[in-house]
């Protein structure tokens, strides 16, 4: 579909929302959130901008982002609000990430930040400013609201109306993987105007609107890595090095390391080991301060346990279901059977599950998200557990 038609379709959809048409846009200072605000203004919404100040210093979540976001609000003629969220970001993200690395997992700060910081802080602000009806961000994802009618014959149905999360149309930019943990209350309040657009169209439209951020380079890293220079620099600032062993699966010691926090499942580079075949990290044992390695052909797993599940587009299943599971951002979702594990304290509630993949998967990484899909629909998701 030509870009003009896609944008017109987006504008028409934005104009169909019922209510007062007041919205606050989460502005990072990047082109995506900038165009989001511009499109909502064009669609006739009463728009205000809000930026969360997460860290001191340079970067998209820091001072640079605040300046660019303020510039966009000035250009569009809308109010700009700044919320000091450094304390909650330290507690929910930085502390949690460091704890994860100490435990030998690879944390996923982006999805946690979306739920526990960005969207929760925006929702809190909206509740305190009752003249604002909706939240909008520049994420590439889509929402089907509980009062909308769509063909959902491929989804399990229990008759309960739910807000449903879908992949963005641009599969190269789809961010639904990082949004699986958003609760129904937030989904019902949120708009993703870029959900039907590609990144290319976003750039074109930003230029058409002469937005100051239209040519701003896209951030290529996690905000923590961007802020500290690299994830290793961030980790080294807070976690002490602790020498340990690198071993094969049979326990044979073949090398040493300076801290398990510098390793992740599947890693090959940076092991500092010369071996007859390339070796990959297959397990990180925090209790023994050990990194276990193996050849790639001996690194696959066919199943994993997923915990802390949030069910999005469906209610928690009561029996095994066939799904596609994505275990890394931008990786392909693979066919699998989801077997519910029930909480004895909550009758018939699936709080974690066993995932059985049709084919062995390389680098199933504890701490990362496993997100369950049915076509474009996000059924739910959770964190990959260290237990097997």
Curated annotation (Swiss-Prot):
Enzyme class, top EC level, equals: transferase
Annotated active site: 113 (nucleophile), 223 (cysteine persulfide intermediate)
- The entry's keywords: ATP-binding, Cytoplasm, Disulfide bond, Nucleotide-binding, RNA-binding, Transferase, tRNA processing, tRNA-binding
Where do the annotations place ATP binding?
Answer: 26-33, 52, 138
The molecular function terms of the Gene Ontology recorded here are: ATP binding; tRNA binding; tRNA-uridine 2-sulfurtransferase activity
Give the principal location in a single coarse category.
cytoplasm
SUPFAM superfamilies referenced in this protein's UniProt entry, alphabetically = Adenine nucleotide alpha hydrolases-like (SSF52402)
Catalysis performed (reactions): S-sulfanyl-L-cysteinyl-[protein] + uridine(34) in tRNA + AH2 + ATP = 2-thiouridine(34) in tRNA + L-cysteinyl-[protein] + A + AMP + diphosphate + H(+)
Q: Identify the EC number(s).
A: 2.8.1.13
Q: Where is this site: Interaction with tRNA?
A: 139, 368
Which cysteine-cysteine pairs are annotated as disulfide bonds in the entry?
113-223
Q: Please list the GO biological process terms of this entry.
A: tRNA wobble position uridine thiolation
Q: Does the keyword Transmembrane apply?
A: no
On whether Ligase is a keyword of this UniProt record, the answer is: no
Superkingdom, taxonomy of origin: Bacteria
Pfam (any one): tRNA_Me_trans_M
Which family, according to UniProt?
Belongs to the MnmA/TRMU family.
Task: List the PANTHER family.
Answer: MITOCHONDRIAL TRNA-SPECIFIC 2-THIOURIDYLASE 1, TRNA 5-METHYLAMINOMETHYL-2-THIOURIDYLATE -METHYLTRANSFERASE
Q: What does this protein do?
A: Catalyzes the 2-thiolation of uridine at the wobble position (U34) of tRNA, leading to the formation of s(2)U34.
Please name the HAMAP family in this protein's record.
tRNA_thiouridyl_MnmA
| Entry protein name | tRNA-specific 2-thiouridylase MnmA
Where is the organism placed in the taxonomic lineage, from the top? Bacteria, Bacillati, Cyanobacteriota, Cyanophyceae, Synechococcales
Gene transcribed to yield this protein: mnmA
């Amino acid at each position: 579909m030509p870009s003009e038609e896609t944008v017109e379709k987006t504008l028409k959809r934005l104009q169909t929302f019922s209510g007062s048409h007041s919205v606050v846009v989460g502005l990072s200072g990047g082109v995506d959130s900038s165009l989001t605000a511009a499109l909502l203004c064009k669609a006739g919404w009463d728009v205000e901008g809000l930026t969360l100040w997460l860290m001191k210093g340079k970067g998209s979540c820091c001072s640079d982002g605040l300046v660019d976001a303020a510039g966009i609000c000035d250009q569009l003629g809308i109010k700009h609000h700044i919320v000091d969220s450094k304390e909650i970001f330290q507690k929910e993200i930085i502390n949690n990430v460091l704890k994860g690395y100490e435990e030998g997992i690879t944390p996923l700060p982006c999805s946690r930040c979306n739920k526990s910081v960005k969207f929760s802080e925006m929702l809190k602000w909206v509740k305190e400013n009752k003249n604002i009806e909706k939240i909008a961000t520049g994420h590439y994802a889509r929402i089907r609201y509980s009062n909308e009618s769509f063909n959902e014959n491929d989804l399990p149905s229990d008759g309960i109306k739910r807000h449903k999360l879908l992949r963005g149309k641009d599969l190269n930019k789809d961010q639904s993987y990082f949004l699986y943990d958003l609760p129904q209350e937030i989904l019902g309040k949120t708009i993703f105007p870029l959900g039907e657009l590609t990144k290319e169209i976003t750039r074109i439209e930003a230029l058409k609107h002469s937005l100051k951020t239209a040519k701003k380079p896209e951030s290529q890293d996690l905000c923590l890595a961007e802020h500290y220079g690299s994830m290793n620099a961030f980790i080294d600032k807070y976690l002490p090095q602790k020498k340990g062993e690198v071993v094969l699966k049979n326990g044979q010691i073949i090398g040493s390391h300076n801290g398990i926090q510098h390793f992740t499942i599947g890693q090959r580079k940076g092991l500092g080991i010369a071996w007859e075949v390339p070796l990959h990290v297959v397990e990180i044992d925090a209790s023994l301060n050990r990194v276990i390695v193996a050849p790639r052909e001996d690194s696959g797993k066919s199943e994993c346990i997923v915990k802390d599940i949030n069910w999005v587009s469906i209610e928690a299943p009561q029996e095994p279901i066939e799904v596609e599971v994505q275990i890394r951002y931008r990786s392909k979702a693979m066919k699998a059977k989801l077997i519910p594990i029930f909480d004895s304290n909550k009758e018939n509630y699936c709080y974690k599950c066993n995932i059985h993949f049709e084919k062995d998967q390389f680098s199933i990484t504890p701490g990362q998200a496993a997100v369950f899909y049915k076509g474009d629909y996000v059924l739910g998701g959770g964190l990959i557990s260290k237990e097997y």
